[in-house]
Amino acid sequence: TLNFTGTWYPITLLFILITAVHGQQIQINNIDTNHGYLLFSDKPVQIPSSFEHHSLKINLTEIDIVVDYFEQRLRTDYHAPQINFLYNKIKRELARITLKHRNKRGFINIVGSGFKYLFGTLDENDRVEIQKKLEINVHNSVKLHELNDAIRLINDGMQKIQNYENNHTIIDSLLFELMQFTEYIEDLEMAMQLSRLGLFNPKLLNYDKLENVNSQNILNIKTSTWINYNDNQVLIISHIPIYLSLISTIKIIPYPDSNGYQLDYTDTQSYFEKENKVYNTENKEVKNECVTNIIKHLNPICNFKPVHTNEIIKYIEPNTIVTWNLTQTILNQNCQNSINKIKIEGNKMIRVTQCKIEINNINFSETLLEPEIDLTPLYTPLNITKIKIVKHNDIIEMISENNITLYIQMIIVIIALILLYSYLRYVSFKPFMMLYAKLKIRKNQNQNTPQQTEIEEIPFPTLYPSIPAQV
């Protein structure tokens, strides 16, 4: 048997505390920092490490040629309302594509040389990297998966239109080509708008490739739209991640230093460092010099503000509490029905696991900060009747059955009316008629032999004579 005396007592007490920590109880550590903030590791995030590029190429010169052809034909030969409507619609759709006019004739051509980034969601590093690869060799460097089928009309449209010149149904053929071309321009406009918003465009993927794309990866997609001045082409690219890396993140928590100053910081985001740059959990590069220096463990250039309190008890996470400049206080611990009292003071970090604690009449628990979610529906559930698909023959049969039922009901009602009339005419009315005849005979007899009866007469209102007007 060991006696807890002398130097063994504090060592044994420390051992008991450590055992309690690893036994899912409570952990209390000193905070030794004088920076004005604390750094906490947060949940790791999945960051794309490599991408697969899917693109759509649009030849602006060929679009201009096709538009000019339609315009010339409308000026000379054809004035069908459908053709004029579609042509005007094409011009409206092209006007929505926000590119500069090269000249009066061109709708969306631009003068320049090489590739230029128009818009998208690439950061500066990705943009520069992709532009270099495009300038060197698009096919070998970026490995674009092109969808030439999507612009098949533009590639061979002129040949088809020339073949229709000798056809008697040229109006119908021209109308059909206009419809196809209009649909293509609408797809082009939609593709550019989705690229501007950073949304995935399914038209940039063949069905077989779309099957192999992870939906989670699509959420991390990047988009870019480029203009190739040399070939007068617009290039719309979807950058779909094919590999994701798990990276730990760091959260910055303001915490007073020994002089009572803490970091002037209110953001709740977490950050990570990659290739000497700092990003937030949305994978966007952080430009704040204060934050980037803190994450990189450099001398931060930040603003600090004084705290206006003598001591602090503060939540950090649902299971973590920090204290600052705390006077000696009793911490009541309730872990798995084991109740203890612990004296704490100063700057401490308290981690709770499956426990409840009380400090200065403030109760804390591991799940105290987790929100209670009310799953009560905000609407009255609908009683939905299952709909059965009815065929044509079934409908005819149902109508026939309903008609038969209606006829039967009508016949029953008619028979009931006839029976009721017969009953009233020949059965029920006869006693009443006999009674009426007897009463009439008795009345006649009373009139022939009047009897002295006292009848109380009901007084009538007095009738005053009229007074002639005085002349």
From Swiss-Prot:
Glycans are attached at residues 3, 59, 167, 325, 363, 383, 403. This is Retrovirus-related Env polyprotein from transposon 297. Keywords: Glycoprotein, Transposable element. It comes from the Eukaryota. InterPro entries: Retroelement_env (IPR012014). The gene is env. Coiled coil: none annotated.
